[in-house]
Amino acid sequence: MANIGIIGGHGKVARLATPLLVERGNRVVSFIRKQEQTAEIEGLGAEAVVRDVMELSREELTELFRDAGLDAVVWSAGAGGGDPERTWKVDRDAAIRTMDAAEAAGATRYVMVSYMGASLNHSVPEDDDFYAYAQSKAEADEHLRGSNLEWTLLGPNLLSEEDPSGEIRVTAEPGESTASRANVARVIDAVLADASTIRKAIPFTDGQTPIAEAIGSVPAADRLDHAV
């Protein structure tokens, strides 16, 4: 059993992942921003901690994670687009602080939900609305790769609301394929149970290969913009 903290615990993917992790015998601590979300999160089997992680310092996060006794941290949060300033603040700065805090608190595992193609070589123009997000995620991912954490980078393609198939395709060339949020949740659960995914980047879409088999066959690649 592991003690797993989920950042962005009330997000769609996090709420789908929580009962899967609990069913596997893990203790899940879900970090949420609003008190009124507590009952729903507890109903999924997690412990709810109402703290705005995005506003906490590295030191405050370290104390929070240490008090929770975390072995692993899952980043499943995001600014949600729109305001570039908030995007930098959440998707880069807060994400990096949680990595540093996890390491300082003694957590060893970190799973980042990024996106397919995330890279410092993204080539998105600075005047493009997508630039703040692309650059923020790329810098956060790069920071994680340089840490001492046992990290896994997940790069789902465009998210959809399809029912879970439990099958994916590991690829950095998605075409028009999508990745259902329910399958992303299952991938989070699966990589946390599979040590062979440590220090690997896994870009994926929905596909025809069972998740456990697909992630178990991923070569040792550390980027989400390389074909697999």
Region roles according to the model:
Residues 27-29, 35, 79-146, 152:
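Conserved Rossmann-fold NAD(P)-dependent oxidoreductase catalytic core, especially the SDR/UDP-sugar
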Residues 2-26:
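N-terminal Rossmann NAD(P)H-binding glycine-rich loop of SDR-like oxidoreductase domains
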Residues 95, 136, 154, 174-190, ...:
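Substrate-positioning beta->alpha
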Residues 120, 152-172, 204:
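Flexible, glycine-rich beta-alpha linker
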Residues 180-201, 205-228:
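Alpha-helical substrate-binding/gating segment
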Residues 122, 163-168, 191-200:
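Glycine/proline-rich active-site loop of Rossmann-fold NAD(P)-dependent oxidoreductases
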Residues 3, 71-72, 109:
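Structural motif
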Residues 30-97, 101-104, 192-196:
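NAD(P)H-binding glycine-rich loop region in Rossmannoid oxidoreductase-like domains
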